[in-house]
C-alpha cells in the first residue's frame, strides 16, 4: 500500500490491481478553510454513508467494499474535472449568486429554501475555489464533451431524485448534493464519496421556507462562521492576499455536528452506526 495524497477529509492510498483505499478522517473544513479541531466519529459516518449510497443508487460506481469503519476500497479511475451539483431548493450559493445578479430567475427569486420547480443541474469547476460553469463553458474549456455534459446532467438529477426519496422516507429534505464522476473501463462512473459533507439535509418536521434551515450536515459549521463574522473575515483576508486564519470551533458546535452526523446516518440507513 502506497500513500498518494491527503485531502480535506480523507487520505488516499494506492493498492495493487488498480484499486485505491480511502481512509476517512474526522477533519473538517468550510469555505476552503481547514480547521485544527476534529469532529469525533465524522470519518466513520462519512465512510459508512459512502457505502450505503454506493450500494443503493441506480448507477455504477467505483465502490468495491468497505474494509473497516473508516476505510473503503474503490477502483482507480480518471476523474472528470467537473463537480456535478444538483439543487432541489433555493439556498446556499445559488441564492447568493441570484442576490449578486450573477444569475437570474424568471419571476424573480423565490423565498429562501423554497423548493425549485425541478431539480437544477449547477456544476462547478474543480479548482482552489470552485467556479460555476454552464454547458457552453464546460465544453469550450475542454472539461467535458457535449454528450458527456448532457449525460452528467441527466444522471446527476437521477441520483438526486433517488437520494431524495430515501431522505424523505427518513424524515429529511435533501436540499442539494455534490457528485463526482470519472472514466472507468470506457464508461463514466460515479466516484468520490457521498455523505453529509457533500449534501444538505434538513429535518422535514422543521422545514420552513423563507428562513435559514436547521442542518444535519456541514452547514452547521458554515452557519456559525457566517453568524460570527468569520466568513466575512475569510473573504477580506483572501482579498488582501493572506491565507484565512481558522478560528477555534466551539465545543458546542463540535458536539452538535457529531450528534447530527450520527443521527442522519442512523435514520437514513435504518441501522446503528
UniProtKB/Swiss-Prot annotation:
GO biological process: 'de novo' IMP biosynthetic process
Pathway note: Purine metabolism; IMP biosynthesis via de novo pathway; 5-amino-1-(5-phospho-D-ribosyl)imidazole-4-carboxamide from 5-amino-1-(5-phospho-D-ribosyl)imidazole-4-carboxylate: step 1/2
Swiss-Prot/TrEMBL catalytic activity: 5-amino-1-(5-phospho-D-ribosyl)imidazole-4-carboxylate + L-aspartate + ATP = (2S)-2-[5-amino-1-(5-phospho-beta-D-ribosyl)imidazole-4-carboxamido]succinate + ADP + phosphate + 2 H(+)
Domain of life from the UniProt record: Archaea
Key words of the record: ATP-binding, Ligase, Nucleotide-binding, Purine biosynthesis
Pfam families per the UniProt record, alphabetical: SAICAR_synt
Enzyme Commission numbers on file: 6.3.2.6
GO MF term set: ATP binding; phosphoribosylaminoimidazolesuccinocarboxamide synthase activity
PANTHER family according to UniProt: PHOSPHORIBOSYLAMINOIMIDAZOLE-SUCCINOCARBOXAMIDE SYNTHASE
NCBIfam families per record: purC
Family: Belongs to the SAICAR synthetase family.
Name of the protein in its database record: Phosphoribosylaminoimidazole-succinocarboxamide synthase
Provenance organism: Cenarchaeum symbiosum (strain A)
Gene that encodes the chain: purC
